Amino acid sequence: MQVPKNNIYTVSRLNGEVRQILEGQLGKIWLNGEISNFSTPSSGHWYLTLKDHFSQIRCAMFKGRNQSVSFKPVNGQQVIVKGAISVYEPRGDYQLLIESMLPAGDGLLAQQFEALKMKLAALGLFAADTKRALPKNIQRIGVITSPTGAAIRDVLHVLARRDPSIEVIIYPTQVQGENADINICQAINIANQRLEVDVLLLTRGGGSLEDLWCFNSEALAHTIYNSALPIVSAVGHEVDTTISDYVADVRAPTPSAGAELLSQDSDNKSQRLATVLARLKQSASHYQLKQERRLSLLEHRLQRLDPKRTLQQFEQRFDEMQLRLEAALTNKLHGLSRRQQQLASRLEQQSPKHKLALEANRLSYLATRLQDAMQDKLSHSGQRIKYVAHQLETVSPLATLSRGYSITTDVNGAVITSASQISLGDTITTQLSNERLMSTVTRLP
């Protein structure tokens, strides 16, 4: 036997190349097997053997990975693991480095979950550009959950503490077990038909993967995606993730976190009240200025017109505008008052009574000033109209006639200013202040 000179492997080289081949070709795999020889040394790492009826393989799961496992493995337990094949070169043993571990039942569900997740992602149901923003001023929240579970108690407690003015409408549904996903879809569809809430909160407490499985339904994913109402998914605990979390517009880690996300504390409510009152004040001021400009324009047009009838029409229009202005301002003030009362009632449990009293006094003071300013402006406008009417009467031809003058016209209505315009026997008309005279020409100069 001739020994080659340049192609002799060392043991380390052989084990290294075997490791590269195994790791490069197999990559990450899922493996089902029974645990044996399970050990937990002081390092915190796990060492075990996975076997079936015919074969076995050594496995290792390091401390950084096994801390995320939600159960304590025991010998004889069937599990599904995900990991990568590697070679432990010092001994030449090949082994599986485990990254995640699930009980055998949950493992099958996890595979189904990953498959559905990939399918829905490819259809675009998780796309960020399809997510809708939550309403800024939430008045009603629709909660889709079991009416007797811990989740609804947590949600109601948080909302009562943070913002008792928010109304809650519960759409009761089954949240675990057979047909639970169908019941949830029906509740979402009912809420979309009624359109009586601003946002939907889909929620339930924690549980095993099997307990939460109804939230991993493909039908439920499409129902959430097609909902006209924005949906917040708050299912389980922070470590739990469901398909509904991926499809929903917003995901909250717990039911309580979902309620906090959809509510504001009382301090923010007070700030919003002050902002609303300031905007209403500005709106009333702008409306008054607009009406003043309109009255000024009417006065200018009135000065360019002559007859009393036109003046009377403008006076009538002015009266109508006055009534409309008074009604508009009254409605504004009533609206401000109603809004203040509503907000005061909503904030009563948070006891912002002192701030509301100050704002109410301020509103009353502004309303009084606005009313006084309106009356002053209307009085001033009335006086100006009377002055304009007097000026029009002064230059009117009828005023000239009332001072003893007269106007004579021929049968065609032409004003006679010279005797040369008439002949003997012509009929002429003389207009006095309040009556007319008919005459026949009998003599000419």
Curated annotation (Swiss-Prot):
Keywords: Cytoplasm, Exonuclease, Hydrolase, Nuclease. GO terms for cellular component: cytoplasm; exodeoxyribonuclease VII complex. The keyword Zinc does not apply. Its main location: cytoplasm. Its EC number is 3.1.11.6. One of its GO terms (molecular function) is nucleic acid binding. It is an enzyme of class 3 (hydrolase). GO terms for biological process: DNA catabolic process. Transmembrane segments: none annotated. The keyword RNA-binding does not apply. HAMAP family: Exonuc_7_L. Bidirectionally degrades single-stranded DNA into large acid-insoluble oligonucleotides, which are then degraded further into small acid-soluble oligonucleotides. Belongs to the XseA family. This is Exodeoxyribonuclease 7 large subunit. The gene is xseA.
